[in-house]
Amino acid sequence: MNNIPKMKIGIVAVSRDCFPESLSVNRRKALVDAYAAKYDAADIYECPVCIVESEIHMVQALEDVKAAGCNALCVYLGNFGPEISETLLAKHFDGPKMFVAAAEETQENLIQGRGDAYCGMLNASYNLALRNIGAYIPEYPVGDADDCADMIHEFLPIARAIYGLNNLKIISFGPRPLNFLACNAPIKQLYNVGVEIEENSELDLFEAFNKHAGDERIPDVVKDMERELGEGNKKPEILEKLAQYELTLLDWVDEHKGYRKYVAIAGKCWPAFQTQFGFVPCYVNSRLTGRGIPVSCEVDIYGVLSEFIGTCVSEDAVTLLDINNSVPKDMYKESIDGRFDYKHTDTFMGFHCGNTCSSKVCNPQMKYQMIMARSLPIEVTNGTLEGDIVPGDITFYRLQSTADCKIRAYVAQGEVLPVATRSFGSIGVFAIKEMGRFYRHVLIEKNYPHHGAVAFGHYGKALFEVFKYIGVPVEDINYNQPASLPYKTENPFC
């Protein structure tokens, strides 16, 4: 993963002037020791400045964490805390921030050793609101050193995603395909969440591709593809063109990222791509996504934005799939019913033509795009990476500016079942509790497109917090609600 941030969280303790400063300082030291004992000490930095009711201390702490290379901040209330200067620190720190508070350690020290940070967190939240400052506050933000170490560690993937978004450029090629309004992408919300976008024509990409013909690096890329594919290299004749295309994209990224640190690509793949380029780009998309540079299909700008968020959160390859087809009843009865605790309507197949990273596919093979080959010569549709998706935990999610130009998101945890799909493409049998109701009352009701991002693991907790942090209204962050919790649009008589 070479396209995601490495985070360093500066821990700044704060203290109310009528409380012992030593209480905050000693608790900060205990917190830092606890983190180093449980996690990677390189994730954090202990700021030696304790802010005590002083805007001057605030400036000193701010300059110190900047000088230490911190790109995220933890304001630690070691006692009640100075509500003005602690929130000013958050205001002036340019990066993701969180607030946590110290719990009282023992019943034997509740006179001089009582810090009242439980109370101070309330005033901190009030002051954050007064100054319109966004910050991550854990579900229960008060704890001892071990508890707070865990909270900071849980903040890491959230901070990675937020910092990544604020330094991301999406590069797109071409408008979405004809008759494909579902990938409509109102760009205003991209800017609202801190993302830049560079929109190019497909012709620009084609010109750059042609200029890479005969590039001296192509043979080495072909060898790398051959190593990756192994026995799945069923289309060796197309690898040279695919390598040429991969180098085209990578060079474009290097030349066009500008002042941004991270890049994601929304690429075109039909209808003219195959006939002009002479292949489909699915395999190249999968390779770049596996390195942390997500490449979406069908110029899905919010799809690749979602993929990038998942890459930052999981530090792993993700994919983008169609919420594609139902599981046949005979397949459900034969392979799922009685073996797994899912209803038939909890299951569906997630599919795309061949864009999923080889590490996430069972026995991956290079093939051709069967759907396109129904109307085109097979030789111009080569380039898909196909196979059943590896079974295991997944999170299906998406951030989207919908048709009304509002920003919404959904998150649903589930799994890919170890059930043979008996089909083609990058495909898997997915199971999500109460998927049928979620499909109707979230995906359909709120006008989501058919593409969903997939992270390989359960990352719902972090993704939910990322969406909250970047300003998605909480009423528009949906999940697969249990049967005991009806959706607002759900018919109570069904």
Q: Which functions belong to the PLM regions below?
A:
Residues 370-494:
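Extended hydrophobic packing segments that form well-structured cores
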Residues 222-313:
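Long, internal scaffold/assembly segments composed of regular secondary structure
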Residues 289-422:
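C-terminal catalytic subdomain
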Residues 57-70, 87-89, 248-258:
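Short, well-structured alpha-helical segments in soluble
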Residues 1-37:
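N-terminal basic/disordered segments at the start of proteins
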Residues 2-9, 43, 105-233:
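Cap/lid and interdomain-hinge subdomains that line or gate substrate/regulatory clefts
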